[in-house]
Amino acid sequence: VSGGVLVVNGSLTSNVTVTNGGALGGSGALIGALAVNGGTVAPGNSIGTMTVTGNFSQTGGVYQVEVNSAGQNDKIVATGTATINGGTVQVLATSGSYQRNTTYTIVTATGGLTGTYGGVSSNLAFLTPSLSYDANNVYLLLEQAASAFASGAQTSNQRAVGNALDTASPTATRHVA
C-alpha cells in the first residue's frame, strides 16, 4: 500500500507492506506478514484488533492507537514475531473520564518482540503517554501529567486554581481527558 488506505475487515491472504503515503486499517485478519515501512497502520474501525497470522514489522511510520476511558484500545496481535525499529505511536483518545495510570496492551506477538518505537504522542491534555515492553508485548501507559492544570494558566488567578487542582489530583481516582 503506497497510496491511499486499505481497510481489511474480513480476511486477506497476502503479505502486506505499507509505505509512505499508504495506510492500513480495519479489524480483520491478515494471513501473511505485515511490514509497515514509513506508512500508517490504524487497527480497528473505531476500537478493534488487527490479527496478523505471521510476522509484524514496523520501520518508521505511524501506529495510530485509539483508546477509550473504559480501558479498551486498538491492538495488533501477531502469531509470529514483532520487530519494531522506530516510528511513532500516535494515541487518539476518545473523550471521557480516564482512570489514572491505565495500561493498554497495543501489540502482542506470540513469537516474541524485539525493538522499540521512537516516540509516542497523544491528543490528551492532562495525561502523558509512555511505552514499555516485555518479551511479547508493547504497552501504552497514560499517566497524570505533572502540573497539568497550572501549565495552561494565563493569569495569576488561573495559575492559583491550576496549582490547587494539581495538588489535589494525585489523590483523585479518575481524570477527565
PLM region spans:
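Outer-membrane translocation/initiation segment of Type V secreted surface proteins
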Residues: 90, 94-177
